[in-house]
């Protein structure tokens, strides 16, 4: 299920993109799962069709979705193991950085120090 948080500073297309990415990577959305049409999801979320189309397009470019005349489906991707997701959550909760970019910068520095 996709939800849009109007208080979130991120644009709606990015919220859709991130939620679908998480669902695909966690295995909640299995390979071959057909997603709602752009118009259907836009109507359900009360968004412009172009907003949903942009999210789908970016997910397709990321290799997570494939579209054809019969619709948009989840591609086969290797899910991120539950242990890795749990470790990431613990890191996010404990690191005390302000943004994803800050967290990535910290990881890059520490990765280089290995």
Model-derived regions, located:
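Short, hydrophobic-biased segments on the C-terminal half of alpha helices
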Residues: 56-57
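A short alpha-helical element within helix-turn-helix/winged-helix DNA-binding domains
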Residues: 34-45
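Extreme N-terminal segment that seeds HTH/winged-HTH DNA-binding domains in transcriptional regulators
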Residues: 1-34, 83-114
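Short, Lys/Arg-rich nucleic-acid/phosphate-binding segment
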Residues: 35, 67-77
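Short beta-strand(s) of the beta-wing in winged-helix/HTH DNA-binding folds
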Residues: 30, 60, 65-66
